[in-house]
From Swiss-Prot:
Annotated protein name in UniProt: Protein SprT-like
Cofactor note (record): Binds 1 zinc ion.
Taxonomic lineage from the root: Bacteria, Bacillati, Bacillota, Bacilli, Lactobacillales
UniProt keyword annotations, A-Z: Cytoplasm, Metal-binding, Zinc
An annotated GO cellular component: cytoplasm
Naturally occurring in which organism (per UniProt): Enterococcus faecalis (strain ATCC 700802 / V583)
Amino acid sequence: MTDQALQTLVEKISIVFFQKPFLHQATFNRRLKTTGGRYHLASHHLDFNPTVFLKYGQEELEKVIKHELCHYHLHLAGKGYQHKDKDFKELLAKTGGARYAPPLVERKKAVFHQYQCQSCGEVILRKRRIDTTRYVCGKCHGRLSWQAKKEQI
């Protein structure tokens, strides 16, 4: 999808769902990493993350567009346009926009180091490696031995 196609889609959604025209500029912004879109308060322009369209398709992009248009129209009307405001929540629910952007970056799985006490057999999981010559078991003060790296979700 090009910026021009995005502009026409935003204008169409604005007329159909909000019954008001979108008079500013809507573009894709590849620098957005974790958000689906952004509304600029000063210029009233909208930026959208192209990853939403590429990863989830046009249906999810339309939900993000509705979300940003809620900010846009409420701000221009002088009403509460922030996420916490009642006006915003009501308009978002009425138009069917997304409350949150879908996950755009995959989270790294946590890796833990597994240690075991040589005396009592207590298993200890740590995110950071520890020096087994300096640290001992907290339960019985026995020596620790490194077992393996474990991935946890």
